[in-house]
């Protein structure tokens, strides 16, 4: 491979402060810095977990991302609510992007904790476009498009399912639950 630059910068080896491939147990927040807790949440796919973050926020907490919309993830949250913090201590839920493991339980958490969901304007608009579309028409158009592109039927079926709206999102995140963050906005 030809380097893009004649200058080569020696980079230090990665450091794993908690050990290589170590992660906390599901539902057991682990403090990684003052007021910053790492929360491991299960996923029912090959990548078997997502990392969520609990941030100390004055006398309460901010939750960053919510987990998959599944009974298993709700049970993990209920464990956190009985062992680490109470729902009333959650001041807000920040959704970083619209993947179902990040937004999946956002509406459930907002209702359970009586707090707003913060999401960027672009992500909220994209989420709305996905959740209000005609799903049957979208799947048919996607199937036709990928067939014309020459993809195998198995690949097409997997991709159309991946892009479909039957994701494990607990319930639709409503605009009334949200504080939409505009470009350059401050939380």
Name each model feature, range by range.
Residues 15-18, 32, 39-42, 167, ...:
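Intrinsically disordered, low-complexity segments enriched in polar/charged residues with Gly/Pro
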Residues 26-84, 88:
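Conserved beta-strand hairpin/beta-sheet module of binuclear metal-dependent hydrolase folds
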Residues 72, 78-186:
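Active-site HxH/HxHxD metal-binding segment of metal-dependent hydrolases
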């Amino acid at each position: 491979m030809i380097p893009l630059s004649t200058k080569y910068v020696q980079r230090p080896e990665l450091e794993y402060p908690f050990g290589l491939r170590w992660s906390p147990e599901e539902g057991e927040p682990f403090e990684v810095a003052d007021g910053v807790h790492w929360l491991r949440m299960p996923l029912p796919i090959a990548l078997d977990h997502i990392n969520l973050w609990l941030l100390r926020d004055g006398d309460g907490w901010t939750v960053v991302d919510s987990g998959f919309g599944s009974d298993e993830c709700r049970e993990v949250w209920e464990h956190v609510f009985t062992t680490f913090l109470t729902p009333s201590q959650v001041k807000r839920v920040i959704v970083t992007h619209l993947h179902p493991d990040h937004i999946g339980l956002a509406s459930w958490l907002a209702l359970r904790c009586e707090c707003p969901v913060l999401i960027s304007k672009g992500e909220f608009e994209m989420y709305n476009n996905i959740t209000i579309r005609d799903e049957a028409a979208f799947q048919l158009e996607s199937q036709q498009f990928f067939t014309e592109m020459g993809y195998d039927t198995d690949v097409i079926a997997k991709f159309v399912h991946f892009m479909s709206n039957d994701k494990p999102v607990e319930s639709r995140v409503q605009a009334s639950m949200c504080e939409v963050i505009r470009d350059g906005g401050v939380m």
